[in-house]
Amino acid sequence: MYELKTLLPQFDIKLPTCMYPLKNVSLAADSLASGSSTSASTSASTSSCKLEANRIDRTGRNAATCALDLDSLGRQIQRLLKDDTASVAARQEKVLKQLEELKAQLGQIRAGLGVCGKTFQHTTAFQNGGLKEVPLQDVVINGHPNFIPYALLALKNAWRNLYTIDVKTFTHSTMADIGPAAREFEANLAKVPVNPALPKISVTLIWKNCEHTEMISSPTMYVPIYGEVNIIRYLGRVGPAEYRYEGSPLCNEIDLVLDICYQLLRCNTHKTQVAMVRLLDKRLQKQQYFGGSQMSVADVGVYSSLIRMPAVTEKDLTPALVAWRKRAKLVVQI
């Protein structure tokens, strides 16, 4: 016959060193079995194989069968398992001791740093669904005196007991005079006190000869947020929880109202302005506020937009919008 190649050639297997080795149970059992068989040949009482001669045919031939000694094999397995169990238990005790020492060291470090020893602390990140809250960076808003961001004053008054917006104003070299309306706006901002006990965001308002109101929220890269409406959205997301509307069922409705405000501020004719006001009236319907029964950032956006549109008088407003404006004025105080 022709010779076949070996399917599993003999080669050295490199065993990993990251884990401790275990004894080979089968090899150990074979070695014990071979040792016991050699010793059993000297004694008939401890023999592992018993020969039974039975005459099974007429020719007188004898058949020999080997009976396995299960008791001896069971004792060998128990002895092997006992040795391995003892070594595993010793290693486990060593690991537990090391963990106790590590726990004691961490306790000393925690005590030295003055960290609370509670195993679990409910933080604000746990309460808002896992969002990580970090200290807010100071923001800078560039605005033209002809397009005063009244939303800053409205939010500052509305959040008087919830959140502090610390606004400081400066004048850019491109502006010779900011005008009486901007100066009155600065005076009204200064009248609202800053409560140091409340969370705060610092806003630097720079009167500048710019086309759009823009906000820079990052001190490292110039990524502006254009438009007063989008600035309201940003402040609504970082402001008090009462005015955060992402988790509200009226989230889409509030965003839609703010979009209408954005279009209203860009209307060039009185006819288009009145058309946008009619859309706002449809969104308000019979509600007290655009966000339902409570004041929201949508109301702040609408109120500020109407102030910036002097051509839209009270005659252009529906009775529902007139009643809403009176209620909102009590909150924003403008």
Curated annotation (Swiss-Prot):
Subunit structure: Component of the aminoacyl-tRNA synthase complex which is comprised of a bifunctional glutamyl-prolyl-tRNA synthase, the monospecific isoleucyl, leucyl, glutaminyl, methionyl, lysyl, arginyl and aspartyl-tRNA synthases, and three auxiliary proteins.
Species name: Drosophila melanogaster
CDD domains: GST_C_family
Gene Ontology terms: cellular component: aminoacyl-tRNA synthetase multienzyme complex; cytosol; nucleus
Entry keywords, A to Z: Cytoplasm, Nucleus, Protein biosynthesis
PANTHER family xrefs: AMINOACYL TRNA SYNTHASE COMPLEX-INTERACTING MULTIFUNCTIONAL PROTEIN, AMINOACYL TRNA SYNTHASE COMPLEX-INTERACTING MULTIFUNCTIONAL PROTEIN 2
Superkingdom per UniProt: Eukaryota
Subcellular localization(s) per the UniProt record: Cytoplasm, Cytosol; Nucleus
Pfam family, one: Thioredoxin_16
Positions of transmembrane segments: none
Function of the molecule: Required for assembly and stability of the aminoacyl-tRNA synthase complex.
Residue intervals of the GST C-terminal domain: 280-327
GO terms, biological process: translation
UniProt protein name: Probable aminoacyl tRNA synthase complex-interacting multifunctional protein 2
InterPro entries named in the record: AIMP2, AIMP2_thioredoxin, Glutathione-S-Trfase_C_sf
